[in-house]
């Protein structure tokens, strides 16, 4: 299936590892022109080199801390200076730290607000003028199944990702007349470094093996396994494509069936 992404300019935030990196590979495979940003400049450079080697596609590398509002504008300006426009934006960011409400400080909340919600708002606001002018755009937010079913011990993530979903739903209606589509992907448990860290932290708290924690999680997943980041990326790339031309304002779980609700 031709997804109609050849030659489209795609900006992927937090693109040096995990779901972001898998999405970058999938977009490059479709012939998109890539720009990647991440805090870790060395990791970002290595990711870009791997993509270029695998797919023969040049990658614009943009070190950027998404929680710092002063860095997002110049990052997007660099994409526009190189490519002239942006067709696809994948809003992805590392999740906020775990923990119950009693352990969270005001600073924890402020950092999570900037990283999880405002990074998506600011990056989107920076690319929207180009998308609206060309009357074609795809914005895909990478969230979590916690927007459908809160995950214990993830107070910050559960709260702020719901804010992203509400913002995205509202924005989708505002920009639909300009053929800019806004959707959110809600992954389930996926084999990323962040999930590995969460498993290790839970095992440490309970003084048990990580395998026991993983088994407890997978007992709740009908498919009985973790997702590969590439499986999430495939859905993101479809939503970013010409083929997803009548889909906007939705939250799409890609969760192995873990969400128990019917809707």
Predicted regions and their residues:
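Short, small/polar-rich loop/turn modules that mediate ligand/substrate recognition or access, typified
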Residues: 90, 176, 181, 247-249
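Substrate-binding pocket helix/loop in short-chain dehydrogenase/reductase
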Residues: 100-101, 108-113, 139, 217
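Conserved glycine-rich Rossmann-like NAD(P)H-binding loop of the short-chain dehydrogenase/reductase
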Residues: 30-46
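Short C-terminal tail/terminal secondary-structure segment
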Residues: 149, 237, 248-263
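Alpha-helical segment proximal to the catalytic Tyr-Lys
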Residues: 129, 173-174, 245
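Catalytic loop of short-chain dehydrogenase/reductase
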Residues: 140-164, 168-177, 189-190
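Conserved glycine-rich cofactor-binding loop
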Residues: 9, 14-18
